[in-house]
Amino acid sequence: TTTALVRKLFDSRHPIGDKLHRKLMRDFRLYMLVGGMPQAVNEYLQTNNFRKVDTIKRDILNLYEDDFKKIDSTGKLSLLFDAIPAQLNKNAARYQVSSVLANDRADSILELIAELKDSKTVLVSYHANDPNAGMSTNKDLCKFKLFLCDTGLFTTLMFKDKDFTENIIYEK
């Protein structure tokens, strides 16, 4: 398998070569774009059509939005979720809630973050001063970053305002 070959080359400290490197990078980019959601993967394998894959991923994101509205009728949960790409693009040390939800109390924000985490649509990465001493004793609940649980959905969410995630991204 490719994995066994890469492991063998890595262990022996031999380069993989340009051809294999290009193939692995193409496969990696493909995974980053399609993601791992079974419906999106199946659509890609059956059709090899990125437009159809993008439609599937947009449908999944719409289902997430519907679920968020059931959990939080104010729409704040959806705002926090939709802002993840912009927040990560800022390259800030943490998710800046105040730029998404101004004038909200910290305890209500923490409840919303807990709801997002429980929905299993995002991963929460908390800041810790000393992770060696045990994360639970050192994590700062007010300093965190949010990441989508699926890279393909993240790519589609980044371009949510477009009708279709641009072909140029898929064709690189």
Per-range role (PLM):
Residues 41-172:
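Accessory nucleic acid-recognition modules appended to NTPase machines
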Residues 1-39:
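Amphipathic alpha-helical segments of the small helical/lid subdomains adjacent to P-loop NTPase cores
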